[in-house]
Structure formats: C-alpha cells, structure tokens
Amino acid sequence: MLKVRKTRAEAITTVCAPGQPYELQELAVHGCRHRVFVNAPQTLHDLYRDNLSDLDFIIYEQQRLTFNDVYQQASMMAAAMVTDFGIEKGDRVAISMRNYPEWIVAFYAATSIGAIAVAYNALWNSGDLANGILDASPKLIIVDQERLDRLALCEGLPASLQVVRTRALENDYIFSLNWSDVLDAHKDSVMPEIHLDPDDNATILYTSGSTGFPKGVLSSHRAIINALLSWELDECLLIEMGVHTPVNLDFQRGMLLAIPLFHVSGLFVSCLMCLRAQRKLGCLYKWDTESALALIEQERLTVCSAPSAITGDIISAGRDSVHDLSSLRVIGGGGMHRAPKQVKSIGEFSDLLQPHTGWGMTETNGLGVGIFGNHYLERPGSSGLCSAVLDIRVVDKEGHVLVSGESGELQIRGTTLFNGYWNQPDATIQAFDGEWFRTGDRATIDEDGFVYINGRFKELIIRGGENIGCGAIEDAILEHKDVIEAAAYGIPDDRLGEEIGVTLYVHREIDEGQLREFLSKKLAVFEIPRYIVQQNKPLIRGDTEKIQRRQVKLEAIESLGLSSIKDD
C-alpha cells in the first residue's frame, strides 16, 4: 500500500494557506458560500493576457502558432466581432468546426469581449445544427467547410445570422465571409477594452441528450477558471503528500488534443490547461493512432487525456511502434470507466508514465474528482478524490445523506457549477436539491474519500424482479483480455421484464460460450448476458465522451433481429 507523507486534508491546509499561490477563501457566489482561489485570474481574457509568450502553443500539421500569435489573431477577430458584426456583451458567438487553430482563436476572441462562446458539436447533422442555432440564437457563427455545407441545408434559420467560414470555399446557398479576409481587415487592431466580471457568462456547451436535444450548459468565467486552477492544485497536493515527484524536463511540455474542442475535456482539460503551464497543444485533423504516435514523437508531447478507447489504442500500438514515445509522462482521462487491465498496462508501459482518470460533467465544467499514479494503480475502479473547491455527498431516494460504502446518488456543490440550462429554467430547478447539483450518477465513497461511480440511476436492468447494475456487468466483461469497451443494457422481455444485452468493442471476436463461462466465475447466474453483440470499432459516444447507452442498445436490437421489440 502506498505510504503518504501527509493526508490530502493536511496537504490542502499547507498548499492553500493564506499567502500561498493557491490560497483559498470563502466567497458568496450566486447567494451561496463557496471556496475560490484568491489569486485566480478574474476572467478568461485575463488568463490569455497573463500568459503571453513566444513559446509554441498550437501545432496543427505544418502550422505553428505561439501564445503571442494566438492572442494577436484573437485581437483582430475580436475587433471585427465588435465593429463589423455588432457583437456586444452577452451576445452569443457560435463555433462549429474540427479542431483547427481557428477554433481556439475564435473562442479567445468571443470570451475576451464579453460574448458567450457557444460550442456546437461538429458531428451534428444539419437538423441538429439548426436546432442548436434556434436554441442559442447566436449573432455570428464561425464554421469550416463541412459545417458550412450543413448550414446551407438548415431550414428556418434567422435572416440576421452572420457567418464566417474558414478553410472553406463559398457556398452558393448561404452568404459568408472568409476568415482570412476578416483578419486582414483588422491586422492593426488591438484587443477591444470591454469590462468583464468574473460572474459574467462565458460559455454554452451542450450536454449529451439521451432522449431529446442536448441541453445548453451556461457557465461563467469564474467557474471555468477555478476548475483550471483546481486541476493545477491537484498536482501540487500529490507532491505535498509525497506520492508524486515532479520531473524536470529540458524541453517544452505538450498535450495531445485527442478530444473535440466542443467537449469540456477538450476545451478546458486539454486546451486551456496549456496556458499557465505553457504547454504546446498537438492537434489532429481526426483521430488516427499512427498519426497520433508520430505527433507525440515529433513534438515530444508529455500528456494525453482521452477516453479509454483512445488511450488503449496508444498503449496497444505504442508497444510495437517504431515511434519514440519516451516523452510521455501522463496518460488517462475521464468520461467512462477504464478497464483495470488498461490502468495496469499504462503503469507497465514505462517507469516514467503515470495513469490518471477523473469524473466530472459539463455542468461542473469538467471538475469533480480525480486520481493519479499509484493511487490509481491501487484503486483502478475509483474515479478519485474530491476537488478542494467542491463538496460531494451521496444520498438515498429520500435525500438522506449516506455513510461510507453505501450506494446512492452523487451530489455536488461548489464554485465550478454551471449557472443553468440555457432557456430551460424548469430543467435547471429540477437539477438541484437546494445548492446541491443532482448528478444522476450512482456512486459510493469509501472510508478514505475515494469515489466509485457505479453507473447512472437510469442504467439499471430489472430482470425478473432483480435490480442489476450495468456497471457491475461491464466491469466483469472488461477483465477479459480481448475486450476494449463494454456497454450493458436491458432488452425488453415478455417473461422477465428485461433481459441483459451487451455490446462489446473487441480486439478479436470472442466465442460467446467461452465468454459466458468466463463471466460465470465473476457474476451471478442472473447477471450473465443473454444477448452479446461484438464490433471492431469504439462504441458510440456523446458530447461528454460518455457511451450513448440508449443508441448502442437500439442498434443492438436491430442487429439481433429483435426490431419488433418496443423500447421505451
């Protein structure tokens, strides 16, 4: 068992004491008392301006932009937003494109002038894109070629919508201005001076919608910045506890951007976390394992935070790769439970490589709990310890707080929570129990404070009167050496109410009989799946990189020839 020099509580007392860089104080935020960082930048614009340098920031194919370059381009675009497009404080500016450098420049520009940056899912079809535009009512949308073509197919768009295109040709069906032309017209401009407050709204990111259209999550500058500093603090606490030793490198650290920027982990955990650390960000046109390995070697990237399917690809392919991956120091990420065998494989890949994971939501700006290094290797099923600026609890159906080891709904409160669902006041009210946000996640907290996420409350299969958690089935299946990802779900059954189905992303096809025999040593008889679907590609994920269980289930019903079954 790992020996620690200090407990986490003792480390927080030391590192967050008055006069320290990560000093914490209680402050009234929206009528509630929350812990905030005293020395935090007040706004996102302050964050950008305070971290200018000639070091590389964005690496995309042959393009390299320094921190100064990005801010300079953002100043030009911000000036255009104010003078050419009439963007005022509180107006929405939408971004919909691949992970191009322009995505980040546009985000810088919008959030520096008090606009609300709206991140649309680049995978949306034209109907979804139209819904997103009608929902957020942006004054301006910035798109690439694919999104411009989809925009041209949208029906019912407001005539007032202004469009800027990048890396795109003109479309005969929709008027747009060219990104480069807009910048050139303002090449001598400086960043407009707009007064911003920490509690001003900064972003709308869309949550995964399992039943209807995703909800827009509205967040403030303060919430986002305190999330960023809390992740920084976590590393300092590990050092203070004596469970992590910082490594001095003679080259610039870098992050592999393996997640879309419209996702909270891509935008905040990967991108904005680079600023204060002065890390470079390696971007890809799309996910490709070989391209990722080559980029890691070329740029000597040190961190990759991504879903388990991607980190699994890196570790699996990296063992036999011709590429030098010795620069990597941290691999992991949240979004979905990582198989214990993958956690172990990260630890075994290199003595210098540390695994990590965490749990957060779009509504918490990605912050929640986290776990790193030996703590994670010892508890591969845990999502970690609570952030220092948040409080968590587990409650039963009646709202009574449960003790360690008891399973219930995880609730959370603190500085980084969102301001509400855009245009959905009723949904916002329903999401809270007083000042506590109802996550909808089933969890337990052990006696040491480590949180274990056991699935969503709606992810229960009721088979013959037995309540069966999807997480337990998935954990057992993930122990099989050929399974990369697993999703369990209930399939309607006339006799039992529901039968158990699973969809697996596998290295190679597994004999179903052998798999059931394997599971018989780990699960009760009534927990062994009746229906098994195998595929050689990752499972479908939503905006928050969580597996879309309902969509996986519907596709399984179709592939199994059970389409006559009616599912609620």
Outline where the language-model segments fall:
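Gly/Ser/Thr-rich phosphate-binding loop
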Residues: 276-277, 301-305, 315-378, 391
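AMP-binding/adenylate-forming catalytic core of the ANL superfamily
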Residues: 124, 131, 141-143, 304, ...
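ANL superfamily adenylate-forming
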Residues: 22-25, 62, 149-198, 225, ...
